[in-house]
C-alpha cells in the first residue's frame, strides 16, 4: 500500500482503533477538487486510494479524479475491488465448479490446490431453487424445503464441500429468502472492516461496504455523505 497522498487516519470506537482513508488529508496533500464529488464517485476514489500499489492502482489513476468535476469522465480503466461478491445459485454454482476445476488442474501439476480461493468474500444465496409442491397448511414451508434437499442432494453436498474447502466463501441455504432480502437484512455491513498487515503493522481498516452481484438488480447499503464527512473530520 503506497498511500501517496498520506491519507491514513485513525478513529477510535470503544476499545478498537480503526484506520480509514481521509479525503481531507488527500486534498491537503495535493489531490484537488474531490470534496464536492458525488458520493458514488467518492466511493470509487476511496477504493483506489486504499488499494494503491503502484501496479494495479497507480498514483496517476487516482490523480485522474481531479478532473472529474470538469469532464464528468475518467480517461482510464478503474481497478475497482469490491468488498464482497453476492451470488445466487444459477450463476454461483458454475463459479464454484470453475474454482474446483482450477484446483484439480493445479493438483495435476503437483501444485498446492489450497491456493485457489476467492480474493473477495463471496456469499452464495440459494433462492431460485425451491418449488411449491405443498401449500395451504402450517407445514407447507418445511415440506417444500425438505423436498428441495431430496431432489438436489448432489448439488447441496457439492456446495457444502465448497464452503468447507474455500476461504472467503459462504452458502446461504434454500428457504432463507431471496438474495436481495438476505443481502439487505443480514449480509450488508454499511461500513466494512477487516484486519490487514501493512508494513509489518496489523491494522483494522474501515471503509465503505461495496458489493458486486451476479444479478441485474443487486442492492447495496451505503452510509450517507454527511456521515462520511463526520468520519472524515
Please annotate each region the language model reported:
Residues 28, 34-36, 41-42, 77, ...:
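Generic N-terminal initiation segments characterized by hydrophobic and/or small/turn-forming residues
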Residues 1, 5, 32, 72-74, ...:
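Short, well-ordered helical secondary-structure segments
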Residues 117, 124-169:
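Polybasic, low-complexity association/targeting segments
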Residues 2-140:
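N-terminal amphipathic, basic-rich helices that act as targeting or association modules
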Residues 151-222:
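Accessory "access/gating" subregions that flank catalytic or transport cores
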Residues 231-232:
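Acidic, Ala/Val/Gly-enriched low-complexity intrinsically disordered segments
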Residues 223-228:
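Conserved small/polar residues in nucleotide/adenosyl-binding loops
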Amino acid at each position: 500500500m503506497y498511500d501517496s497522498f498520506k491519507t491514513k487516519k485513525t478513529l477510535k470506537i470503544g476499545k478498537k482503533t480503526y484506520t480509514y482513508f481521509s479525503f481531507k488529508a488527500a486534498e491537503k496533500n495535493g489531490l484537488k477538487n474531490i470534496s464536492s464529488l458525488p458520493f458514488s464517485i467518492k466511493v470509487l476514489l476511496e477504493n483506489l486510494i486504499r488499494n494503491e500499489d503502484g501496479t494495479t492502482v497507480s498514483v496517476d489513476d487516482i490523480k485522474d479524479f481531479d478532473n472529474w468535476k470538469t469532464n464528468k469522465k475518467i480517461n482510464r480503466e478503474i481497478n475497482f475491488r469490491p468488498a464482497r461478491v453476492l451470488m445466487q445459485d444459477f450463476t454461483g454454482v458454475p463459479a464454484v465448479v470453475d474454482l474446483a476445476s482450477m484446483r484439480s488442474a493445479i493438483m495435476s501439476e503437483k501444485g498446492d490446490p489450497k491456493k485457489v480461493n476467492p480474493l473477495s468474500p463471496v456469499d452464495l444465496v440459494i433462492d431460485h431453487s425451491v418449488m411449491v409442491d405443498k401449500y395451504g397448511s402450517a407445514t407447507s414451508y418445511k415440506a417444500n424445503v425438505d423436498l428441495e434437499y431430496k431432489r438436489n442432494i448432489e448439488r447441496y453436498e457439492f456446495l457444502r464441500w465448497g464452503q468447507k474447502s474455500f476461504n472467503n466463501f459462504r452458502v446461504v441455504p434454500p428457504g432463507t429468502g431471496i438474495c436481495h432480502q438476505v443481502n439487505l437484512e443480514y449480509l450488508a455491513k454499511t461500513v466494512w472492516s477487516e484486519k490487514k498487515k501493512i508494513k509489518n503493522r496489523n491494522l483494522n481498516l474501515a471503509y465503505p461496504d461495496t458489493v458486486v452481484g451476479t444479478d441485474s438488480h443487486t442492492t447495496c447499503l451505503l452510509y450517507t455523505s454527511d456521515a462520511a464527512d463526520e468520519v472524515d473530520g
